[in-house]
Each structure stands twice: as structure tokens, then as C-alpha cells.
Amino acid sequence: MGKYFGTDGVRGEANVELTPELAFKLGRFGGYVLSQHESEVPRVFVGRDTRISGEMLESALVAGLLSVGIHVYKLGVIATPGVAYLVKSEKASAGVMISASHNPALDNGIKFFGGDGYKLDDERELEIEALLDAAEDTLPRPSAEGLGDLVDYPEGLRKYQQYLVSTGLELEGMHVALDTANGAASTSARQIFADLGAQLTIIGENPDGLNINLNVGSTHPEALQEVVRESGAAIGLAFDGDSDRLIAVDENGELVDGDKIMYIIGKYLSEKGELAQNTIVTTVMSNLGFHKALDREGIQKAVTAVGDRYVVEEMRKNGYNLGGEQSGHVIIMDYNTTGDGQLSAVQLTKVMQETGKKLSELAAEVTIYPQKLVNIRVENSMKDKAMEVPAIKTVIERMEAEMAGNGRILVRPSGTEPLLRVMAEAPTDEEVNYYVDTIANVVRDEIGID
């Protein structure tokens, strides 16, 4: 991570940390870096989610892009993976998404995609940061005829919707409940699943700029669970604010997280001989039960640090086509370059249709170990140094010794927020609570803030 770029672009409180001035510079400098090797006039696609600050930041970002001669295609409200798909499929120079994903409405973020549809690597981000920190802006300032054009491009959303529909199966007769988190999926999920023929019940589809992720979506699936139970839906599908995540709900109202979704899709692909190298890429946060289920099926796994960018790096490096995170980021590389909640939803319903099994039956093949995760607010300057604090290091070692190999502990910094995450897994809830609470109390005493 750099000074400005975290694990998922530049994020901060809108108009306080992520200001219009910074957005303009990111557009200007980011656009310049990403278009240096273009033989034709560069084209950049820009999308946003439904946050009230989105249009403000979009206007500033677009101005920066236009100022270095880049043609900008405004996609409007669209899922982050929709931007990635369109950049690659339409051979654009780059893409930019304005979103803070699952964060609350007061936050926003800006993330870049290269012309290949993948998020930027560290080297490109550092190039942009160097320009941001330069004492003077020395980039070219073209006169009127050299400025970029601004194009509204609503067709992009329709093309993305049609593409996702083309990857699925007819769902005639299936009752699907959707929760679009009052976010980016509110412009697309209804149409996608209607085109597939599903009977729909939808919540979280009325964004007002302030209610994105508010008690809805993949981080708050309780409302969808209730809707599924009351409506008799066969499946519930909850997206986050920018629709790069999916959390599902089975017909009984029980949660099906990213680990189970990856297992279900991965086993399906493996049985068809379509799981590249018979391997799923996952992170250190995946549940022990997920690993045991893969072992039982003879499916290999590659484990990375937390963050979908690290999963994607591993997939690209070794030619894998399925990976993701427990949080619901699922990357299906045969179809898109990044985590795509709506794509994952289409593929999950496809497995249900092809196998004729209920989601609860498919998910029951993974027995999840009790897991507890506690987030502790700390200073940003301390979250990467926690393991250097003697008391924290000692209590973790003591808890691991007590586990005696039957469970695990993970303490890590958030990539996007001033938080230290303490996670444990063990055979019983009582043990998990004991391990996590013991460590969390020491962390709070040593480096926690109110």
C-alpha cells in the first residue's frame, strides 16, 4: 500500500479526506499514467455507485481526465465489475469506479482499472502517487482542440446486463429474492434476473444517496433472511454497495457465505472438468470447514493474503479460474477479471438448476467451524505494527498453544479502515469467544482508541 492507495484504491470520508480537489488530481494524473502508451486518443470509462458524493467526485475526476486530452465515457450508476468488463470488452484505455464498496455512505473511493480490465498493480499506483506528491504539476495542458470529449454512455450498463444473462440458465419458476443494498446493483439486478425468467422479490432497491449499505446488503443480510422465510423464495441474493460481493441465503433463511459459494461453484466446475488445475484460490480468512470440504473432494487450494487483489494476482500468475473470499468476493476468471456479485449470483442459480438441488443441500456439504471476528479501532499508524507490541504477541502465542492445533487465530490490519481485525476458529462457540475476547481485550488495552 502507498500513501494514497490502499488495497482497493483511494478511500476516505467524502469531501473531507477524498475531496473534489484530490479527485481532480487523480483523474488528471491517473489518466496521464494510464494513457502514456496509447497510439490513438485514450478512452476511459467512468462509473459510480449511489452515494450522494458520487456525482461531486465524478465531476471533478472527469474534469481531470478531460484536462489531459482523454475522452471520457460516463456509465452512470453501475457495478464495479461492470466497469471492468466494459473496459476489456470494448478495448478502452482504462476504467475508473467511484465507490467505497461496503463502507457507509459518508465514505467514498476511487479505483482504477487498466485496459486489460484488471485493477492497477503497485507500480502503476506508485507512479500516480509520485505525481500527486510532486511540488509542481508539469503535465501537458492541451488547448481547446486537444481536450477530451465527454460522452454519456448508458448503453454500457445494458451491455453488461446482457452479458451476465448470457452466462446463465433459464430460471422460469424459480422464486429469487434480491437485496441490492440501495447501491450499484439497484440499476441492474432486477433486469438480469427478470430476463432469466425468475419470479422476483426485491429489497434495498430505493437508493437516496445516504442509505447505501444501511441495514441492507451483503454486510447486513438479516432483512433478506426474513424476506426469504416469509416469501418462500428458493434463494436470496445480497450484494454490497458496488456489487462486487455476494452473500446468499438458502430457502430456509440460512446464510451461505463466500466460502460456501466458492465450494458450490468450484465442485460444479471440477465435476465438469472446467476448474483450472482443479484448484480454488482463497485467503487466510477462509474457514477450516471449507478447507476440509475441498480436501474431501480432492480439490486443491492456493492461499493468499486477505484482499481480492491478492487472489486475482495468484490466479493470473498460475492460470487458475476460480477464487475468492469468505466475505463474498468471488472471481470467476472465465467471465470477468474481478469479483462480481451479480455474476456469482447467476452462476449459483445455474448450479441449482443444473443439479436440481436446493441451495441448502448444496451448502450442507461444507461444515463451518464456529468463527468470530472482532474489529478494534486503532490509529492508522499502529495497525501495521500491532504484532510488534510485546503484550499482543505474547497473548496470541499463549492462545495458539492452548488450541493445540485444533483451530486457528488470525490478527491482521484492515486494508481500507483504521481497524485491527481479530479472528479465531475452534470446535465450539465457547472456545471461539474465549480466544477472541482474550486477545481483543489486550489489543484494546495496548493500542485501542474510542
From Swiss-Prot:
Keyword Metal-binding attached: yes
Modification sites for Phosphoserine: S101
BP-aspect Gene Ontology terms: carbohydrate metabolic process; peptidoglycan biosynthetic process; UDP-N-acetylglucosamine biosynthetic process
CC per GO annotation: cytosol
EC number annotated for this UniProt entry: 5.4.2.10
Domain of life, source organism: Bacteria
Gene Ontology MF, one: magnesium ion binding
Cofactor: Mg(2+)
Residues involved in Mg(2+) binding: S101, D240, D242, D244
Enzyme class per UniProt: isomerase
UniProt entry keywords in alphabetical sequence: Isomerase, Magnesium, Metal-binding, Phosphoprotein
Cofactor: binding comment: Binds 1 Mg(2+) ion per subunit.
Entry PTM: Activated by phosphorylation.
Reaction(s) catalysed (UniProt annotation): alpha-D-glucosamine 1-phosphate = D-glucosamine 6-phosphate
Catalytic residues in the record: S101
PANTHER family, sorted: PHOSPHOGLUCOMUTASE (ALPHA-D-GLUCOSE-1,6-BISPHOSPHATE-DEPENDENT), PHOSPHOHEXOSE MUTASE
Function, in words: Catalyzes the conversion of glucosamine-6-phosphate to glucosamine-1-phosphate.
Stated family: Belongs to the phosphohexose mutase family.
Protein name, per record: Phosphoglucosamine mutase
Organism, as annotated: Streptococcus sanguinis (strain SK36)
UniProt lineage: Bacteria, Bacillati, Bacillota, Bacilli, Lactobacillales
